Amino acid sequence: NAPRPSKIVKLSLEKMGMNKEIRENVYSSGEAALSYLKKNLLNKNFYHLGPPKDFDLFLDFKENKTSSIEESSYLLCTGLFEKQSEDLNYYKELLKESINKKMICTNPDLLVDKGDKRELCAGSVALIFEKMGGKVLYFGKPFPEVYNQAINNEGKKVLSIGDNLNTDIKGANLLNYDSLIISNGVHKDEIKKEGIDVVSKKYETV
């Protein structure tokens, strides 16, 4: 789950030292969303929720980005604004008059750990919008569309590896894939305290 095109994600992985043979097969949630947007909403004005680092997602149709949420046809959520990265109440106020618009969420993750810092992701904003009565179209794990676009799994065995029970493991279970949980990730404190069986049931992954 990354709210940017696959080519941008591959560059990041290259800088991290990932083997070329592996990273060439990377497919991002942003790429899945981009495919949908180009087919269905290419000429529509949109309001972007997210930081400037995600602008690569809509470079091909950046002229349709509007700074006025009232003038937008749909909402494109890639994350949180840099100056409003922790206060979800800000988004409740911002979105309350746009419940009739569709939101495209390019990263269903609710949160991510970056080093010792925990950050909110696009999924947290999308969840608030849904609870307010809005409609959200998700791209990324655990939703099937990203798997359908990324994997030709006919006759193949698939192993889904990740640290997030809400997305990585839930997505694998929905599609009947084998999965491997990285226990030293976002749920590490819960798993250490309660055990994986209890925690996985709490997140309704099984």
Could you tell me what each predicted segment is?
Residues 2-206:
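Asp-based, Mg2+/Mn2+-dependent phosphohydrolase catalytic module
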